[in-house]
Amino acid sequence: MPAKRQIAEARGRQAERRAALWLRLKGCSVLAARVKLPGGEIDLIARKGRLIAFVEVKARARRDDALGAVSVQSWHRIARAAEVWMGHRPKFAGYGWRYDLIALAPGSLPYHLKDAWRPGLA
């Protein structure tokens, strides 16, 4: 793997660890991280009560850049992976679920945008 790609991977893993810690501090259980499934990848899967959140994590120099860094195509891939993940976990059949985004930028707290995207609306 090229050095530039290794640095990006390391930064991504660090951002995901920070986001997972933030979710735990907010009372969520982190069920899984870096989940690769047919059709897509999910950065974090978290649970709070009877709600499952499929969380995309983005770290950029500015928070606004992180908030705009997920394309509609990426959300569709995340949604496909989420459907596969939920389909293999019947114990969560009665739970609600949503797609969240955690934006990270130097010098600021993580910004958790709940329900950042909904299938069929974009």
From Swiss-Prot:
Pfam families for the chain: UPF0102
Gene Ontology molecular function: any one: nucleic acid binding
Recorded family membership: Belongs to the UPF0102 family.
Species in which this protein is naturally found: Hyphomonas neptunium (strain ATCC 15444)
Protein name: UPF0102 protein HNE_0764
Superkingdom of the organism of origin: Bacteria
Alphabetical list of NCBIfam families matching this protein: PRK12497.1-5
